[in-house]
Amino acid sequence: MNPRQATLALFGVTIIWGWTFIWLKRAMTVADAYGAGVLGATLFVTLRFALGGVLLPLLPGVRDAMRERAVWRDGALLALFMFGGFLFQMVAIAQLSPAVSAFLTSLYVVFTALLLAGWHSHLQSTSLLCGVVLVTFGAGWIQGPPQLHFNWPEWLTVLGALLFAGHIIATDVVTRRVSPIGVTFSSITLAALMGLLLLDLQMLVQPAALGELLREPAFLQPLLLSAFFGTFVALLLVNLCQKLLDPVRAAILYALEPVWATLLAISYGMVTANGWLLLGGGALLLGNLVAELAPRRDST
């Protein structure tokens, strides 16, 4: 696989993540209706990883990779970033407007560039930095100017964005030294175990809500879709393909997710179409085109 093929594969991942945003909103709406927002978020994340990892042992090479200690060590690192980011985002998403959530989550693009600049003691190329600015603006304004209040859901989303940036950088490092398929399985499995531990504590407070959500089709349908497409398919492609791209280039590409999420939200009547979609979406696309001018990473 070459960098261009990897870019196309990860482009497909952004479309999957756009759908995942819709499924997530639906599931959290149901959980909030039962008065179990935090429990619902933990349950969703836990089962999303657990169900998404069930099919991975069927892939060739996974069982052999599972015997390597390094696969589990690196999988634990990815799991911490991944589980924390998704959980913080889900807990906060019900309290935020789509515009604010999209903008604050998109800060992972900036965080990725800043963390790498601090790590390597130099800035990225001019093309990548311009792409970072454009996609951050585009993600924030795709549904109108975000109205920030600096409350706890917003700070929680910012923390989630920081963890997503850590996951992007860690993925670049980890998938170069251990089996990408093996670390996909170990990270998903460990993330599910983290969720299970947290879920056990929350069940002490709301034991009845768990059974109600597990019997609710409106909660289970988006959960199953997210588990297969958002976890099994998307994370497998990320771990196989991202190492062929610069981490900042990958972060810029991932920022296309709000375009698909907004278009889908419009089609389902969740939001209305307006000129901000053209402005924000145009900035996101332009940012990716500018980033393509940056020197490509060697695919070897």
Tell where the protein language model's regions lie, with residue ranges.
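Specific transmembrane alpha-helical segments of multi-pass solute transporters/efflux pumps
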Residues: P57-S101, T105, L134, A139-W141, ...
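Helix-helix packing/entry segments at the starts of transmembrane helices
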Residues: L47, F83-L87, S101-Y108, A170-L193, ...
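Transmembrane alpha-helices of multi-pass small-molecule transport proteins
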Residues: Y34-G84, F111-L115, L134, L163-A170, ...
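C-terminal transmembrane-helix exit sites in multi-pass transporters
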Residues: L55, G61-D64, Q89, Y108-C130, ...
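Glycine-/small-residue-enriched transmembrane alpha-helix faces in small-molecule transporters
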Residues: M1-L43, F88, P146-V173
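Hydrophobic/aromatic residues within transmembrane alpha-helices
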Residues: A27, F44, A92, S97, ...
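Membrane-interface helix termini and inter-helical loops of multi-pass transporters
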Residues: W23-A36, G140-W152, Q202-A218, P222, ...
